Amino acid sequence: YALPQPLSETALSDTADIINQFYQETELPICVTAIPDAASFYSDAFPDGMPYVEQKPAIKQFYNAIDLHIRKTDAYYILEAESNDYIYYRTFPYWTSYGAYSVYRSVIQKLGFVPISYDHYTVSHVKSDARGALYQATQTDAVMPDLIDVYENNSNPLTCTVTTTLQDNSKKERDSLYDADALQTDNPYQFYLGEPAPLQVVTTNVQNGKKLLVIKDEWADCMIPFLAQHYETIYLIDLHHSTTLPAAADYQQVLFLCHTDTYTETEAFANLLTT
């Protein structure tokens, strides 16, 4: 078991510089969202003496280093206010769909849209006995299994095509955001977008000409269904699997949507944004 390490302020500052340079070169509207982990809110449930890293100061320092013209989402503040609800999985190292929805409301406003209110959605549990990496490591039944949820907009149903470009440059296509086969695997969280891939292009029935580039890690995946309600096309670039961006003419806005730890991976940002 590896002890949690403090976030590198130097690495966060270097990543902020790279994002600032990308903004200066593209002059596109950009929003940055750093997602804190669950330990920030539930440390009182840890055994005595168990170490954890408080991420709030590092997120503040990171945001302060980002250009004032780039919009930032205070996901920490939003999730702290919702911390009595089911916003993080118990057995997966990710937030839940409800956690993602809570932050989506702020993200989409910063991108110029009105968020879809919660009462417009029907929530379905597509898997009620999901067990993630924490369960796989401990094999203990003391922790309740997780719920994998789908939010469907009753007033404006969404249809999507997802075109995935794999590492070997081959492509596959499906007529849904969701990969139902993943529900039967050891990582049912991959239901939301499927296995990580360098590029996924989401094409929707929202015929408004709006196109978004999302630079992401796996934490972003369960927010994409909410974002897709507002865009005709979304380009999803996985920071851990891609070093190439779509042509700048293909999108009008950029969203950085990653777990806070991911923003310390300066080399990955440099490879993607400065080559």
Regions found by a protein language model. Name each.
Residues 1-275:
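Extracellular glycan-modifying ectodomains
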